[in-house]
């Protein structure tokens, strides 16, 4: 069901509309109810700051990164009517503790699953294109976070801030996050990627980074559902046997699994069949390994172009960190459970914006990724804050106006030959270097 249909369903019985009711149109109340029950926090008690309002304050922490949590709740006007118009800071702290992080996690996962199953996406050779990659977030430096998440270390001990390691599964053509998993810095990305297996949809191709080469993980991935394929760059030291050659640059190969891998993954066979494809870009050779062993369904010419789309998940991480999070290095929350809650709220806020962008491009000859995320984000925030709510029947009209506005923010075509090396500029020195000793200066 699209967001506009939620407007129609609610408008028949919303007479005296509150701001919280307007926000419920964007995030289906049924999803919230299921998430609260699943997390065991649902209650029949009527509070002035109900769980739905606390959920929106957690989402608002990402939409209004430079505002305090107290200001966010008051600007969104999410508390129910009462004697006091403003929400006390202590009430928000207690509300976040009542909400917990699992209810926000379930809300994110339910919304992502419902959106993917009801929307249509661009496909490649009949498969939905997905991507998996990891990213880290920095937390406040305190003992609780160090014990929960850990940090990098060197010969002198632990350094830097505690960090959360995250691994995400994303639909490429829309940047919609299907699921995420995060844990301590001590947990590797491949272990986190295994937790994403239940979210892998049928008829999909997942693009991995080179670091995810694990035959146990890849075997589980391709057997997770119907036509669940994978692709990643081949290592330089890859050991294989050629089963047969499709052409000089395209081969079906046999990969041998190690005893250690078979011990860790009980269902892993001694050998796996894969496809090794070689192609050139600007005179440089590249090799990709995949489970797409049918050359008739997946022609060589198509395989040489698809892997470049893995970079879309890097762009999505940039949108989250630089766009929503305003390039802030450290998350707001100071306790481990609240850090987890804030991260799930950040992913949920990102998906809500992406879902609205999906609605804006529906039945249009443009992709959601062709719209400017930063401009769309500002318009969505303005919709939440300034849309008049005196009449429920007007809400679908305002929402249509929002979608029309988003369609104006079409990005220019990407340059095909652009090149951005992974380097950083040298920072200028704040103070001049002292090149002579004090005795010479005197």
Description of each model-found segment:
Residues 77-93:
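Short, basic interhelical loop/turn and adjoining N-cap
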Residues 72, 76:
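Short alpha-helical "recognition helix" segments of helix-turn-helix
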